[in-house]
Amino acid sequence: MVGFGANRRAGRLPSLVLVVLLVVIVVLAFNYWSISSRHVLLQEEVAELQGQVQRTEVARGRLEKRNSDLLLLVDTHKKQIDQKEADYGRLSSRLQAREGLGKRCEDDKVKLQNNISYQMADIHHLKEQLAELRQEFLRQEDQLQDYRKNNTYLVKRLEYESFQCGQQMKELRAQHEENIKKLADQFLEEQKQETQKIQSNDGKELDINNQVVPKNIPKVAENVADKNEEPSSNHIPHGKEQIKRGGDAGMPGIEENDLAKVDDLPPALRKPPISVSQHESHQAISHLPTGQPLSPNMPPDSHINHNGNPGTSKQNPSSPLQRLIPGSNLDSEPRIQTDILKQATKDRVSDFHKLKQSRFFDENESPVDPQHGSKLADYNGDDGNVGEYEADKQAELAYNEEEDGDGGEEDVQDDEERELQMDPADYGKQHFNDVL
């Protein structure tokens, strides 16, 4: 191998040149470093100078602004000074006016001091009057308390008296209702007695006239024809005259209003009296002696029920009038039924008149004196009215069931008659409550 020097070319620089170059590079690097450090210092100084310039500019702006503010303050102070001077002028004028008012007030004060003596005298007089008024007020308070005590006593007394009056009114109402019940019961008893009398008389007359019925047939037909020609309104005044003959029963003026108040009858009294006519037609037969036959032409298979009323078989459903009057003309039967219907209507109206007479007072009249109760109790009513017994009604019901063949069904007419029997007392109570 060859060393470093063996292969070196001829004509090249030695390593000294390299060293010189390295030295030059080091010197240049040192110079660059020094120059760069100096440049940095200069830049810092320039930055500081710029900051100072900015601060000085800010301070200058502040000073200028403060200067402008001070100028404005000077202007405002000048204006305030001018305003204060004007206010001072006004206050001086007011002060002069107040001084004038003070002088006038002093004059008024002197006058008021002069008037104080008079006012003190007036105050003393008013105090005396106040004491008198207080005494009067206390006295009136005592009187007011006394009046209140008397008022409470009077109120309690009034309540007690009103309670007693209410109790007395209740007792009087109870007595009045009892009197109405008694009068209704008396009316029913009298009606039953009259019915018994009339039934006994009718039984006797039928026994006597049973033998001479064929002779009286023409007269009966003539009487029926005459009654059919008469208007139905002729029967109502007749019943009214009968009531007037019996007396007013301590209630004058009721009879004049009877016909105008027929519409006030309960529904049971306003029903057509068909059942009453049938009952009267059967009643004439029920009181015949059970031992005698009704007529010679009575069929042998006819029987008499347990009430004494003759019954009919289903094979002979003839009317009781045909049995009573044998051989009579069939054309006269409607007239006889019409006559019986009119007579029943007349009896019903007379019963209504008696019911109205049994009341203590009328709707359009003042209450009747209780002393007239004896007159009402002594009133016997119309002797011509005919009552109805429950046994007769049951007999009529049995007779109607046998004629109709309904096998024991209830009869509407019998219910109506029962309702009619209970109507007088109930109607009197209801009418009395309506008047109260």
Swiss-Prot record:
It is found in: Membrane. Residues 225-436 are annotated as: Disordered. Residues 35-198 form a coiled coil. It comes from the Eukaryota. The keyword Cell wall biogenesis/degradation does not apply. The modification N-acetylmethionine is found at residue 1. It comes from Homo sapiens. Residues 36-436 are lumenal. Keywords: Acetylation, Coiled coil, Membrane, Phosphoprotein, Signal-anchor, Transmembrane, Transmembrane helix. Residues 305-321 have a biased composition (Polar residues). InterPro entries: GOLM1/CASC4. The modification Phosphoserine is found at residues 233, 275, 328, 332, 366. Residues 1-14 are cytoplasmic. The chain crosses the membrane at residues 15-35. Residues 399-418 have a biased composition (Acidic residues). Residues 225-247, 344-362, 426-436 have a biased composition (Basic and acidic residues). PANTHER family: GOLGI PHOSPHOPROTEIN 2/GP73-RELATED, PROTEIN GOLM2. Its main location: membrane. GO terms for cellular component: Golgi apparatus; membrane. Belongs to the GOLM family. The keyword Chloroplast does not apply. It is a single-pass type II membrane protein. This is Protein GOLM2.
